[in-house]
Amino acid sequence: MALAISHEDTQILLKDKNILQESVLNKYRTAGQIAQTALKYVTSLINDSYHSKTTQRQLTVPELCLLTDSFILTRLEQYYKNKVNERGIAIPTTIDIDQISGGWCPEIDDTQNLLNWNKGKDSTFASSVTGTLRPGDLVKITLGVHIDGYTSEVSHTMVIYPVDETKPILQPTGPLLGGKADAVAAAHIAMETVVALLACALTPEKLPASLGGTSSGITGQLIRTIVDTIARSYNCGVVPGSRVRRIRRFLAGQNEGIVAEREYKGVVWTESHQEADLLSNTDAKDLTVVDRGQSTPFTNVSAIPSDDFVVQSGEVYLIDLKMASLEHCTKKGLVTLETVDSYTGKSHKAGELIARPGAYVRDFAQTHILKLKTSRQLLTKIDKQGVYPFKLSHLSSNFPFVHENEEELQSLKKDLKSFRLGMSEISNNYLCVESPIQIARWVPWDHILKATNPNGNLSYDATSTLTLPGHELPLPKLGVSAIKLKSLMNSTKESISLPVARECNTIVLCDSSVSTTDRPELLRLTGGSKTCQPSWIHSQHELNPQDSIVQGIFQLATLAKDKRFGLLLKETQPMKQKSVETSNGGVEETMKM
C-alpha cells in the first residue's frame, strides 16, 4: 500500500508536475477532446443500432466497448507521438445498464459464458447478460483518456426508447417516467450545480448568500450538502462511490484502494455517511454506538478522504455522481453496493447476476516470481500499460481494430484464451487486482439494526480490495463490517436492486494566466451541452423553492447562463466529423480538429 519515495521525488510528482501551465493544460484539453469525441461516437453507434436502426444488425455491449476503445487508441495516434512517454485509455469503456453501478465491460468472448452462467435466472439483468439493449434501459457510458498522465474522464446516462415505426421519421413514443426518470433528473441537475459551484471558487464574490456567501469559500461540506439536497428532492439516494475529488498527474482515482494517495482532496459518499445521517436523526436513546474511528491502520491521515478542504484555482476536479431511485423503497434503508462474482452454483437466489470482471489494475507494490512462461510474457505487456486499468483485449496484437471482421475476432478470442491462463497466476499472486462489477442494492435499516453481530469489526472481507483508506468498515458506528453487510443483503427478501443514473465530468479551474481570456474561467474538459444532453424524461418530483439551499441552486443556474455578469464557463468541443461509414457492424470514422 505504501512505497518509500524520497522528498525530492514527492515534490516533483505531487507538486511540480501539477502546476497548471499552458503545456499541461494542452494535454488535459487534448485528452478531453478525444474523450468527448469517443462519447459522441459510441452514442451514435447506439442510436444507429437501436433508435434509427440504420445498421444491418444491433451491436452488442461487448462490441460497443471494443469498438470505442479501438476508436480512442486510433485517435490518440494523431497526438503527442514521440513527445510523451505514456498516453492511452484511462478507463476501459464500460456500458452499465440499469442496476449495475459500474465495471461492466465484458470481453468479446464472454457472450456465451454469460448466457450459460445466468441460464434460468429472471430478466432483471437480461440486457446485460444478452448484450442487447432493450427499450427502457438506462445505459451509463463511461470512458477516459490520458496523455502523459493528465486524465480526462466522462460518464453519461442515455435512455433506450421504444420507437414509433409508423411515422416516416423514427421518433420516441414518449418520455421516460417513474423512478428511472427521477434518477436521471437528479444526476443531471446535481452535475450542473456542482460545476457552477466549483466555478465560484474563481470568483468567490458571486457565491449566493444562501450558500454561505464568501465566508469560507467552496468547501467539501458545502458540496456534499448541495448534492444530498438534490438527491432527497428527487427521492433518490447518492450511491456509495460517488465523489467530487481533485485529480493530479497519474492520480485520477483509477486505483483508489491500491494506492493510498497523499494529500487526498475530495468529497466521497460512502455507507458511513448514511449511517451518520440515520444516527443524527434518531430519537432512540438505547442504541449502542461504538466509535471505531481510531481503528484505522493508516498513520498518514492526509490519505483519508475528508470534507475539510477548500477548492482553489489551478486545480483539476473529477465530478462523478451516481443517483439511485428509491421509488420502490417503502421505509428507510441503506443504499450500498454488491460485488458481482463468477462463482456458479452457490445459490438459486432470484435477481442474481453471475459474471467475471473485464478490467484489471496493476499493483506495482506487489512482486512475485511467476512460474508460467505465459504469465511472465503477459506481465511484461501489462507493465507497459502503466497504472491505469486495462482489459486483456488491449494486450492483443489485433488491437485496436481498424475493421471488424470474423478473422480478427477469432484471432482476438485465441489471444484471450492464452491471456486468461496467464492472468490466473498473476491475479492469484496479487500482481493485478480485478476492477469489480457492482450492483446498487437497498437494505432496510431495521434489518441491519436487529441483526446480531458478535464479531463486530473483527471480521474482514479479504475480497474487498479497492477500499479507500479510513473506510474499511462500511458502518463504523454500528460496528458492521463489509462481510457482515454482505450477508445481511442476502438474508432478507426486502433487499432490492436499484436503477442508477450516472454523470461524470472533468473540469479545470483556470486562473487568468492560462485562461483564453483575461478572466479566470472554468474549462469543462468533458461533458456539457454538446455530448451530455439529458434524455427525454419526466419526473414527478421537483426542487422545493422555499428551501434556502434550493434557492442557492437556482441562483447558481442563473449565474451559469449569464454570459456577461455570471460565471465564465467554457466547454471542450468534440472533433468535427468528416465522414462516417457503417456496414456490417464495422465502423470507420475520420476526424479533424
Curated annotation (Swiss-Prot):
Keyword match Protease: yes
Single GO molecular function: metallopeptidase activity
Gene3D superfamilies reported for this sequence: Creatinase/methionine aminopeptidase superfamily, Winged helix-like DNA-binding domain superfamily/Winged helix DNA-binding domain
Major subcellular location class: cytoplasm
Subunit structure: Component of the nucleoplasmic and cytoplasmic pre-60S ribosomal particles. Interacts directly with REI1.
Family note: Belongs to the peptidase M24 family.
Protein name stated in the entry: Probable metalloprotease ARX1
